[in-house]
Amino acid sequence: MRLKLFAAAAALACLAAPTIAMSKPLTVCTESSPDGFDVVQFNSLVTTNASADVIFNTLVSYDEAAKKVVPSLADKWDVSSDGLTYTFHLRPNVQFQTTDYFKPSHSLDADDVVFTFERMLSDSNPWHKVAGASGFPHAQSMGLVKLIKAVSKVDDHTVKFELNEPNATFVPILTMGFASIYSSEYADKLLKANQQTDLNSKPIGTGPFMLKSYTKDSVIRYDVNPAYWGPKPKIDRLIYAITPDASVRAQKIKAGECQIALSPKPQDVLDAKKDKSLKVSEAPAFMTAFVALNTQKKPLDNPKVRQAINMAFDRTTYMKTVFDNTGTPAVNPYPPNTWSYDRNIAAYKYSSADAKKLLADAGFPNGFDTTIWVRPNGSVLNPNPKAGAELLQADLAKIGVKAQVKVIEWGELIKEAKQGQHDMLFMGWAGDNGDPDNYMSPLFSCNAVKSGINFARYCDSRLDKLIADGKSTADVAQRTKAYVDAQKIIHDQALWIPLVYPTAAALTRANVGGYSVSPFGRVNFGAVSVQ
């Protein structure tokens, strides 16, 4: 009997073993289609999630738990005593992905890093104009062209960056998605074949997943990269099910059609907490939701008009209606858990009467006509876009301002807003590394007006100098003073209507392990498993 039982147990074990060892696909319900996969051209979080977060790697990355920059493709780096030279030592034997459209002949080397940055920095580089009208928004807004004097190859596995001036934010900047490292060999192949646009549709990186197929507004399929240099993913395939409606994303995860649902509505989060088949991952987000007021459009060029608009908007009702009172009311450009946040600044007090009086003082006693731009579908930074826009529209009507709500598809909205076509724009920003400059340079510098992501389109020499001063030294006290003074200008000029510091959340099936929502809106599926 003992032998029979043992044999039966062994047989069962053999039958069960493949099931235990076998990895499974992971389907993620995402909110919209990426702009493409050539991440340096774009600044949307959706595009970063679909490209930089899964296909590529950067020289260094940001450890969210430890709150510090850590090695990635570079396993170490040195900084000269004057803060002007950074030398990165590349990890050996890192392979670029092998696909049916490219087979690399060598591993990652210094030429790849030099190509990646020269493409963005040098207008004589043949790849510089490939980005077209979109340019390189992050590189431009962060001022890298002015900051970086030269990028050069020391040897096959060593790269040197020479700066024109010390910059405390340089290494953190390299954690951002736009700093993903590209294959120079693949770029040369495409250039010779006159197929440069393939870089945006057929990406090659060093990351854990590689693109298999993409159907716009429907699905992105990734295979696991078998040559990945880091820990191998615990899933065998990754699928992005593009699902713009947050309510539909919630329905899909309840039905088991996806294992992770990103950017749920606050009410869906509350419902999921009561559902034993689901889990909720939450974190205070390093994000800010806001309405940008285009200072290059009349009468929004008048600071009194912008202040009146701030006074006219009932943000308490907005918080309740759009965010179900989750998150924290916003006052300054970045969240209060950020060092240098100025707690002495108070939000504009809601008062239609005071707003109307100030508008009259500005020369508009009968109001004016304007537009409010908003995306059609919800996200963590705007769960119910149209409802929020209609609340602002109704409040502005009380002071005589006639605002037309324009619901514009996300890709078109970003494109036209970067050209400054909007009046008032519901927008949001997710930081990448916890540094205040991650908001200040891309959203308020003069460089960012040129790149298009300073949506207030405000260029002021005083503010620009404070932003520059804030990153020219590593002294936290000096940086804090610069950023506090900058926040006062931003508030007094009423460049935004600050809305909410949201809570980042994601829903997962109960059988999913290893996934944590990022406060920065990034995604990491490398450690995720599906039981």
Question: Model-derived features: where do they sit?
Answer:
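Detector for C-terminal structural segments
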Residues: 24-30, 50, 168, 215, ...
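Surface-exposed binding/hinge segments that line
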Residues: 89, 121-187
